């Protein structure tokens, strides 16, 4: 049994997009929560190309004497997950906690995530209790969660909640993945050996409106499916095989009916044409599926994701262990 790695410093990464109204309260509550920790801390707020005064507010907070805040300013809007990855590239902590800027997930939950992560967990996920979102957002979130679980095989209760904690080696592994479209919770689970989910509170949004419109949710769904799995490509072969088998069975049925009950049961060969058409359509889908397999392999190679991830090497030779983990 391995000894849990000590957490000497905690980094908080918060993506910000047009949240100038909530920023003062967000920073106050986050600092207050981090002061309860037994470890050092830093708070990285990543401005994702905001069109309001969010960048100015963050800059002023970061320049204040004795501030624990680090402002990372992006030149334009790249999206929530890209902004978080930008924050990851600047963290210095042993444990990294991500948090949304809308205060719907209370920063007061941070000490609990750190406490759970200290029990030798690589990733600590969260499940929102008594969600305060609209009916549409709840239904959309459930559909996306179900779709992700079916297509990726990663069973988690709430993919949409960004209040999560990651060990430093998980962050380093994700930074070695250079694909442009990614979904951090699933990517982290790809490298995690030990994960857990805990329930957290969920509050109503006090400032502004949600930045996820209907079209952004639809785009997110497509990004999730296409950037994390090649299952849709393989489904072409499955559907094609089913159509071809259906057409073949239909043709056998028509031949049997014609032989035993007369030609009128086969509609003078018209139904047989449909059966043959089904077989050809199925064959086309199978061909597209095979082509998709090759495209999927090219896609996986282009992403340049590590073939494997070694969390640690236990050896009596410290030098050997160091070389293996580089």
From Swiss-Prot:
Q: Which family does it belong to?
A: Belongs to the glycosyltransferase 2 family.
Report keywords, A-Z: Antibiotic resistance, Cell inner membrane, Cell membrane, Glycosyltransferase, Lipid A biosynthesis, Lipid biosynthesis, Lipid metabolism, Lipopolysaccharide biosynthesis, Membrane, Transferase, Transmembrane, Transmembrane helix
Q: Could you say which residues form the signal peptide?
A: none
GO molecular function terms attached to this record: phosphotransferase activity, for other substituted phosphate groups; undecaprenyl-phosphate 4-deoxy-4-formamido-L-arabinose transferase activity
Q: What is its EC number?
A: 2.4.2.53
Gene Ontology BP, a term: 4-amino-4-deoxy-alpha-L-arabinopyranosyl undecaprenyl phosphate biosynthetic process
Record gene name:
arnC
What GO CC annotations are associated with the protein? plasma membrane
Q: Which organism is it from?
A: Sodalis glossinidius (strain morsitans)
* Reactions accelerated catalytically: UDP-4-deoxy-4-formamido-beta-L-arabinose + di-trans,octa-cis-undecaprenyl phosphate = 4-deoxy-4-formamido-alpha-L-arabinopyranosyl di-trans,octa-cis-undecaprenyl phosphate + UDP
Q: Which InterPro entries match?
A: ArnC_tfrase, Glyco_trans_2-like, Glycosyltransferase_2, Nucleotide-diphossugar_trans
- Principal location class: membrane
Which enzyme class?
transferase
Put simply, this protein is called Undecaprenyl-phosphate 4-deoxy-4-formamido-L-arabinose transferase
Name the pathway it acts in: Glycolipid biosynthesis; 4-amino-4-deoxy-alpha-L-arabinose undecaprenyl phosphate biosynthesis; 4-amino-4-deoxy-alpha-L-arabinose undecaprenyl phosphate from UDP-4-deoxy-4-formamido-beta-L-arabinose and undecaprenyl phosphate: step 1/2; Bacterial outer membrane biogenesis; lipopolysaccharide biosynthesis
């Amino acid at each position: 049994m391995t000894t849990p790695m000590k957490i000497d410093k905690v980094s908080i990464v918060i993506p910000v997009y047009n949240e100038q109204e909530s920023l003062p309260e967000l920073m106050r509550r986050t600092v207050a929560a981090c002061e309860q920790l037994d470890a050092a801390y830093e708070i990285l707020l990543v401005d994702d190309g905001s069109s309001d005064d969010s960048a100015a507010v963050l800059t002023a907070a970061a320049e204040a004497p004795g501030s624990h805040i680090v402002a990372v300013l992006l030149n334009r809007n790249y999206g929530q997950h890209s902004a978080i990855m930008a924050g990851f590239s600047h963290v210095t902590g042993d444990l990294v906690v991500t948090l949304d800027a809308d205060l719907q997930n209370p920063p007061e939950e941070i000490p609990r995530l750190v406490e759970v992560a200290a029990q030798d967990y690589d990733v600590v996920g969260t499940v929102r209790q008594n969600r305060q979102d609209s009916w549409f957002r709840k239904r959309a979130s459930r559909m996306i969660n179900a779709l992700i679980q079916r297509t990726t095989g990663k069973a988690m209760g709430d993919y949409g909640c960004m209040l999560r904690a990651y060990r430093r080696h998980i962050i380093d592994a994700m930074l070695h993945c250079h694909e442009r479209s990614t979904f951090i919770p699933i990517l982290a689970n790809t490298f995690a050996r030990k994960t857990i989910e805990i329930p957290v509170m969920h509050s109503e949004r006090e400032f502004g409106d949600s930045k996820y419109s209907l079209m952004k949710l639809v785009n997110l769904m497509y990004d999730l499916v296409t950037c994390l799995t090649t299952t849709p490509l393989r489904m072409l072969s499955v559907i094609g095989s089913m159509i071809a088998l259906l057409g073949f069975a239909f043709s056998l049925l028509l031949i049997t009916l014609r032989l035993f009950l007369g030609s009128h049961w086969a509609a003078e060969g018209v139904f047989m044409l449909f059966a043959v058409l089904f077989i050809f359509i199925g064959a086309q889908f199978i061909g597209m599926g095979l082509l998709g397999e090759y495209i999927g392999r090219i896609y996986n190679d282009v992403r340049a994701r590590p073939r494997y991830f070694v969390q640690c090497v236990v050896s009596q030779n410290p030098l050997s262990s160091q070389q293996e983990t580089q």
